[in-house]
Amino acid sequence: MLERLQAVEDRYEYLNEQLSDPNVISNATKLREYSKEQAQIEETVQTYRQYKQVTEQLADAKAMLEEKLDDDMYQMVKEELDELSERKAELEERLKILLLPKDPNDDKNVIVEIRGAAGGDEAQLFAADLYKMYHRYAEMQGWKTEVIEAHATELGGYKEIIFMVNGSGAYSKLKYENGAHRVQRVPQTESGGRIHTSTATVAVLPEAEEVEIDIHEKDIRVDTFASSGPGGQSVNTTMSAVRLTHLPTNTVVSCQDEKSQIKNKEKAMKVLRARIFDKVQQEAQAEYAESRKLAVGTGDRSERIRTYNFPQSRVTDHRIGLTLQKLEQVLQGKLDEIIDALVVADQSEAMKKAEE
């Protein structure tokens, strides 16, 4: 492990030198590439340097214990030794995690798609609850959200809502939300007070850059139509809504959120690119995913990952068996406790695999 860490530190120093080179500074592509790589390994390098410093302090403390010391001094050095040993062990564990292979998509912005599934009106209302939850979570993280497409219902739910989340590390956190979310509650329209079970599905796609997925104009059919609101009524008379069909994969994306046809097409292209990129990745990872069943689930969007039980004010994440009696807080966007636990479970599983 120490050899790998030293190699990472050497690379960090090399990148530092390159970023001061006038030839690199004048080359925008190289400058961006080197800056990004340096940022990705910075935490590893800083943690490794702390580890080396603590290791030296530990050696000094051990050497002092071998000298002739009075009782008070001996006790003081012994306490320092214990603290340093504990700190060294913590840093070792952190470094093991930092050396795990990174998901190349973790730093990307994301496109989130929420759809009401089983349960009719109640499922669509729950889809709206999930959108509000993620919107609030994004705000707490300092991320920006932007609605790309929304099919609202007259009751205030969503048949489907697609939105973008822009922010550092958005995919690294939100990727754990992929799957089917189940709600158990008494609908407002239920006179008998019976609990209904409904589901909504969440898809989290990393934003794909143009260089990552090559889509030819000739492969896209563009249709325009008038925007419509809840219930299907027309909300404007201009043909501003856009539907894109990627002919080779039969992937269809619509966008009518903007008044401008050009802006709707730009938003639709982002979703189209992300969906095709996701499809390519899913196919490439299918065989690997079969051999490595993640502790946090397969990521399959049909997999039930979480239940929100209103009568018991309970949220249960089925992938890691975590139950919290904090339903209201979770729906207010306080997802850190759940997502942090999923990250730890994922890292633990990855460490086991690395040690095999």
Curated annotation (Swiss-Prot):
Domain of life: Bacteria
Protein family (similarity comment): Belongs to the prokaryotic/mitochondrial release factor family.
Organism: Shouchella clausii (strain KSM-K16) (Alkalihalobacillus clausii)
PTM note: Methylated by PrmC. Methylation increases the termination efficiency of RF1.
The name this protein goes by in its record: Peptide chain release factor 1
GO cellular component terms, semicolon-separated: cytoplasm
GO MF annotation: an example: translation release factor activity, codon specific
UniProt lineage: Bacteria, Bacillati, Bacillota, Bacilli, Bacillales
Main location: cytoplasm
Signal peptide region: none
Modified residues (N5-methylglutamine): 233
Cited function: Peptide chain release factor 1 directs the termination of translation in response to the peptide chain termination codons UAG and UAA.
Cell location: Cytoplasm
Keywords: Cytoplasm, Methylation, Protein biosynthesis
